[in-house]
Amino acid sequence: MDFLALPKIDLHCHLDGSVRPDTIIDLAKQYNIELPEDRDAVVQSLTVPEDCKNLDEYLACFSLPLQVMQTEEAIERISFELYEDAALENVKYLEVRFAPILHVNKGLSLDTIIASAVKGMKRAEEKYDIKGNYIMSVLRMFPKDSIKDVIDAGQPYLGKGVVAFDIAGGEKPGFCAEFPEYTQYALEKGYRITVHAGEQWHGQNVYDAVTMLDAERIGHGVHIQGNEDAYNIVKEKQVALETCPTSNVQTKCIHQFSDHPIAEFKKDGIVVTINTDNRTVSNTTMTNEVKRVCETFGLTKEDYVEIYKYSVESAFASDEVKQHLMGFVEQI
């Protein structure tokens, strides 16, 4: 298979983890933000080390991008460039998630932040053969009184570039019990729901995310392995797993790439999708993810078609966009 030419779909990609290093350098100079001494050092600070010890070390790579992403221009540009980078490797549909609350440090309103991200995406959609949507994330450690503000701020953009609500950040057992009020609020406003769960060993969180938070999709979810309740509910309800194989190895969720359960899950009828998570932090692309999965697990063209269709069906896109995406199957 020509992996670059394959049509691809990425449903789990973080904006602040997918910024071009040269853009960081350019914006940091504009905003007088202190940088590491040279480009190599900047890249090093943005990219997870080979011997990354855990998710917390992985998350440290977001510090510099978040410093520069505090103006309308920076957010719009970075949004555009992410969609441009994806389009140039034949990603036909991309859902990007970010936490607007992390971009208020210089006084931007939540509305301005969301509008800037959507504007950058729309500019890329006009220029390239790519469709997209945004997912509003909150981090588990956020003050709870800010969560409804994010949901309210995104509501005017629903169906116009925003589609879903996500809970992210470091994972602790039992976190779902704190959030039903907020996912219910988001559902009432018209959001779809995806939740990061089962990334850091806690398979029970996946079961809770589906039963308590009404999650339609699960970010990562690899640790349904070993938790029968979680495994069964994901399989029975056809809850899509947004797997991010390279990232899962880097954060030590999975010991090595060949141990990733994606192929095993697929064989057993679980809905799996292939995603990047963070293009810059993980130093990856969709082409790389698809290639590694197919080559490591011996997946055929037919297997890839099935995963591509899973991604289309699981996307928080309109029926019209889904029909458009299904049209690319014959190119595989």
Curated annotation (Swiss-Prot):
Binds 1 zinc ion per subunit. Its EC number is 3.5.4.4. It is an enzyme of class 3 (hydrolase). It catalyses: adenosine + H2O + H(+) = inosine + NH4(+); 2'-deoxyadenosine + H2O + H(+) = 2'-deoxyinosine + NH4(+). Substrate binds at H14, D16, G169. Zn(2+) binds at H12, H14, H196, D277. GO terms for molecular function: 2'-deoxyadenosine deaminase activity; adenosine deaminase activity; zinc ion binding. One of its GO terms (biological process) is adenosine catabolic process. SUPFAM superfamilies: Metallo-dependent hydrolases. Its cofactor is Zn(2+). Keywords: Hydrolase, Metal-binding, Nucleotide metabolism, Zinc. The record marks H220 as: Important for catalytic activity. CDD domains: ADA (cd01320). GO terms for cellular component: cytosol. The active site is at E199 (proton donor). Catalyzes the hydrolytic deamination of adenosine and 2-deoxyadenosine. Belongs to the metallo-dependent hydrolases superfamily. Adenosine and AMP deaminases family. Adenosine deaminase subfamily. This is Adenosine deaminase. It comes from Vibrio atlanticus (strain LGP32).
